[in-house]
Amino acid sequence: ATFSTPLTVPDDGDACNAASVETPFQSLVNQTQVLFNGLLNLKVRPSLRSVNGTDIVIGAVPMIVGTEGATWKALAYAGSTYTPAGLANSTWYYLYARIATGSIAISHSTTSPDSYLRTMNGNTDYVFLGSFRTDGSGVIYPFFSRDGETMYAASVAILAFSSAPPTVATDVSLAGGVPPYSQKAYLNLIGHPDTGVAEGMNVKTKGVTAAGISPVALSFTVNDKNDSGANLTWIQTDTSQTIQYYFDVGGGASRFALHVRGYSE
């Protein structure tokens, strides 16, 4: 559809025929379709936060756009506190809003959003608001989310202090702290070298092989064995939620810990 201007319509006394009526009305329909397409691509997300492990506070937004049956609708949302029930342990959940009979209902599901992160995959009645994860006891990880970026109130441990970390790139999954649709993870890296010589601890996005990129990994210097180094960094993630890590030198007394502090779409 095209956004054509100006619109010329029949005036009093003008002949009304296919040429004078169809053309301006087709242009008007085209403009309406353009505006509708733009509305569908406008993702208005509310702020989300959970601090007590059971409730999610959802902020207000000027409109939620989704279908009710086969009809597209837009409705303002004043915000609310939602308490999801029946949460399983160590599971990703997705929060949705649904327009029904003039009001908005909130629900959660293990069904992920579509590739546009706009509605539930395969069901446009459910508008995607964000995601959350439970720990090993079914408690919601405390988090704050806005504009597609989520930060945890406490870091999610992915790799505890491990002895003798590898000196070659080794896979580690971020699935415990990063949802499948995420593009970036915010990491807290803690390193402790074996010897008294400073060395590098490294993380990298798996699969980056482009020629001319040197170094491929993000490298952070950790000092002598009496001093641990801690660093915060963003890193790109692939759809498998897997990155790689290693030490330059390593050794039996070396330590490496990796925590997720947040993620971004």
Language model features: what each stretch is:
Residues 125-139, 185, 234-252:
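Noncatalytic modules at the cell exterior or secretory-pathway interfaces
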Residues 30, 34-57, 111-169:
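Glycine-rich, low-complexity segments
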Residues 62-64, 87-99, 144-218, 257-265:
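Beta-rich globular "head" domains
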Residues 73, 77-85, 101-141, 210-227:
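Acidic, glycine/polar-enriched metal-coordinating patches/loops
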Residues 30-31, 96-112, 133-135, 187-197, ...:
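Short, flexible beta-strand-to-coil junctions
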Residues 1-37:
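Extracellular "spike/adhesin" assembly and maturation modules
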Residues 223-239:
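Beta-sandwich interaction modules
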Residues 37-113, 197-198:
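Glycine-rich, compositionally biased intrinsically disordered regions
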